[in-house]
Structures are given as structure tokens and as C-alpha cells.
Design a protein with these regions (language model features):
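Alpha/beta-hydrolase superfamily serine-hydrolase fold, recognizing
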Residues: 15, 52-58, 62-294
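A glycine/proline-hinged amphipathic helix-loop "lid/cap" segment
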Residues: 1-65, 293-294
Length: 294
């Protein structure tokens, strides 16, 4: 059963969502950036942010401890929204909760910069991290579009012959931009996302590239020899089957994957500061430490 707090938050989201759906891309970006700045204010005196001059990114570093681990964090936003402040928001939370250096990437967005811009930026960020940390000390974490991008990045890392990170953690990853497996019931249950809105964003991101291209929709890629994976998803979201199918395919290809499905939760519920979010963060901490701390 969902917590009282999550039920209240869900009600508020349901009331506000019709208005949010009316926002154009620019207003959506401004809203996400504002949320990121709010997270940063909450993290004051816990996390420091340092600009990275060579790539469009920032380091989020925990103030009260040293760390020899690194997280490459890829934010969500349907590939059309999110930005520097939004990335630093949840990236800062990861730095504080997982006690790690977090590289918060501000990757280029569609429609101004369609595929493969975001993937190219993710590759450069990972190469930058590899110059500072050994691969066994690096994890990739992504949510929503950033979760799908994280898996696309792994496929590209393998293609380039780079060392694989220690593990990957994703939250409600968008792994199939064709949206062929999103059911009508999934769309109705999700208070945050709509199938129509996602497909619109998918076409903006893909541009002239087919939606089932494995670097656009990693579910169609070669998922052999992937690092250990942890996936979080809610039962009440459009992308539920993306997570289930990705988990199943990882297992079929001989990889180790853990799938955590939270009842009555919606898209990227982990980011909402709920009791259910706390439980997910604790699972994330345990998984991250198992794979990066010697």
C-alpha cells in the first residue's frame, strides 16, 4: 500500500498535470531548472558544486567526506528538457546520499540538437571520468530519458572498446522510444507522463533517425557483456514495460540485473522525497557500495 505522503503528492500531481501539459518546451525547461535550483538550496552545506571547464558539466561533491568513487549522472526530461541546474539538483542528492563525486552532465537537448548529440556528450563525459577514476570506481546513473541514454552509452562504450563502469543504476528508464509496448492502461495510470507527449518528444529527439535504432532505443541493441544493473520503476507508469523488458533482456544476455517494482508508484517516484523514495535510495546505496567500495 502506498504511504499517506505519496497519496497526497499523487493527488497534487493529478490536479496540476493538465496545466503542466499545456506548457511549451521553453516553459517546461524553466520549470525543471527551477526544481533543480530548489534541490540545490536544500543541499546547502552538504554538497559543493564545481564547474568542469572541458565539458558542459559540474561536479557535485559531498562536503563532509572524501570519496574515491565517481557517478556519471544523466538527467531526465524526455531529451527536450532538463539542463545544468536540473542535473545538479538530483546529482547533488546522489552525491550526498551515495557519498560520491557526481559528474552532472548538461547534455545538449532536442529539438535544437537531435540525436546523436546527447549520446556524444555522454561519451565525452564518460571519457573525462575515466581520466580521473578507474572504471571499477565509476557507476552510471540515469533517470527517465537519462536512464535510456545510460544504456545507450553502455552499448557505445562497448563499441568503442572502452573499459566498462562498475555498474549501472536507472530509474524509470525510457528504453524504447517507439512506444509500441506502452499499453492504454499504463498511460491512464501514470499521473506524470502521457504516451502522446512521449512520442512527440521521441520524434524530436530522433530527428531523421529511426526510433528503433539501438542507440536511440537501447532495448533493440546488443546488451551482451553489460555491467551489473539495478532498475527502479513504479507499477503506475507509462514506462513500466520498458523496465521489465530491459531487465529481462539483460538477463537473457547473461548479465546480472535487479529489478525493483514499487506498487502504486508513478514515473521517477524516487525523486519525490517520499518514504518509498527513501527505501529506493537505501537499495541504491547498498548496490553502489557493493560494486565500487573495496
Amino acid at each position: 500500500m502506498a504511504s499517506i505522503a505519496s497519496s497526497l503528492v499523487r493527488g497534487q500531481i493529478t490536479l496540476l498535470n493538465p496545466l503542466l501539459q499545456l506548457l511549451d518546451t521553453e516553459k517546461t525547461r524553466k520549470l525543471q531548472e527551477a526544481l533543480g535550483r530548489l534541490h540545490q538550496r536544500v543541499l546547502k552545506n552538504k554538497v559543493s558544486f564545481i564547474d568542469v571547464p572541458k565539458i558542459s558539466a559540474s561536479w557535485a561533491k559531498p562536503d563532509d567526506s572524501e570519496s574515491d568513487t565517481c557517478i556519471v549522472y544523466l538527467h531526465g526530461g524526455s531529451y527536450i528538457a532538463g539542463g545544468e541546474d536540473y542535473s545538479k539538483g538530483f546529482g547533488g542528492i546522489l552525491a550526498s546520499e551515495l557519498v560520491s563525486n557526481v559528474l552532472c552532465l548538461n547534455y545538449r537537448l532536442a529539438p535544437e540538437n537531435p540525436f546523436p548529440a546527447a549520446l556524444e556528450d555522454a561519451v565525452e563525459a564518460y571519457k573525462y571520468a575515466l581520466k580521473i577514476f578507474p572504471a571499477k570506481k565509476i557507476a552510471i546513473i540515469g533517470e527517465s530519458a537519462g536512464g535510456g541514454l545510460s544504456f545507450s552509452l553502455l552499448i557505445k562504450i562497448k563499441e568503442l572498446g572502452l573499459a566498462m563502469p562498475s555498474c549501472i543504476i536507472t530509474i524509470s528508464p525510457w528504453c524504447d522510444l517507439t512506444m509500441e509496448y506502452a499499453t492504454e492502461n499504463d498511460c491512464k495510470k501514470d499521473p506524470v507522463l502521457s504516451c502522446e507527449g512521449l512520442l512527440y518528444s521521441a520524434k524530436l529527439y530522433a530527428g531523421d533517425t529511426e526510433l528503433d535504432n539501438p542507440f536511440v532505443s537501447p532495448l533493440y541493441g546488443d546488451l551482451s557483456s553489460m555491467p551489473d544493473s539495478l532498475i527502479f520503476v513504479g507499477t503506475d507508469e507509462v514506462l513500466l514495460h520498458d523496465s521489465i523488458r530491459m531487465h529481462d533482456k539483460l538477463i537473457q544476455h547473461g548479465n546480472k540485473s535487479k529489478l525493483h517494482v514499487e506498487d502504486d508508484m508513478w514515473h521517477v517516484y524516487v525523486l519525490y522525497g517520499l518514504p518509498e523514495s527513501r527505501k529506493a535510495i537505501e537499495k541504491m546505496q547498498e548496490f553502489f557500495m557493493e560494486h565500487t567500495v573495496e
